[in-house]
């Protein structure tokens, strides 16, 4: 179903683009999307640290933060946590976490978040420490206070519907103005890993509105890029600063999508003959990795095709490691050794080519992207001053 919905969104965006003209850089909408993947969030965190450093260098401003440059930041699961960390304001109304603070956060708190509950029944982890640290870091901040538009997904197991937390939806659905720590726990509450999360807010007329939520990947798979694009499309329709954009399309968008790594080989390959007699229990051991890798590949395929078809391929950058091995493939191995390996994966990824057809390294591509983000921010600021 997620693949069908993704394809529908893709077709809609292509059709909307056919009658449009090229956008100037100052009119472009900028989108950052961060995949889910548990402790593997260290990989995109390493990439974000590099990008924020480049933005600071280009603009000669050590206080520059990612939220200053992106109109929409979307994330699922651990990507939702990263989204909250770089968009939640501190007491001076700046992001409470710089990108360089995220990897140390994983090292400090990861081992306690992924500490086994010791029970053979129920979820693998009780989630108590995760909630504790989220409340400590995010405080009472709610969605409307985010420093830029956010798109954090979850899934309500009582209504069987996805729930998308965004600022632009609040006028219509004020009950979505939840506390950020409730949202972050919910998007990370992967079935079998953490308990589902219940909390309540109020509707516009004061009625109680209840949520029963699990991991956002249930609703949007691990790659939330298409979700983030959808939110950007709506934002362009309602935000006055995008008044010059009559119909948002790929020519008017800069999209950076960060993965948490996958593997083309898994831990083992299988044949049809070998798996013919497998039952539910045996498939459950491997299906999550298979579906996660496949859905991530298909989303990237859709987006690459759309941007290339409209001669806007430089507007989209997917940063993904496709050759994870061993413990780095695990969502919950928060050992010191494995976390160090994940940092190394992120650092090594910067030196790799974007694709077989594009010899540009990710490091070079991100430097180019940083320059585009900086130039676009300056153009918009100049336009606003008139």
From Swiss-Prot:
Limits of the PNPLA domain: 32-229
Record note on modification: N-glycosylated.
Entry keyword set: Glycoprotein, Hydrolase, Lipid degradation, Lipid metabolism, Plant defense, Signal, Storage protein, Vacuole
Any one of the GO CC terms: vacuole
Span of the annotated motif GXSXG: 75-79
Placement of sequence motif DGA/G: 215-217
Annotated motif GXGXXG, positions: 36-41
Role summary: Probable lipolytic acyl hydrolase (LAH), an activity which is thought to be involved in the response of tubers to pathogens.
Protein name: Patatin-T5
Higher taxonomy: Eukaryota, Viridiplantae, Streptophyta, Embryophyta, Tracheophyta
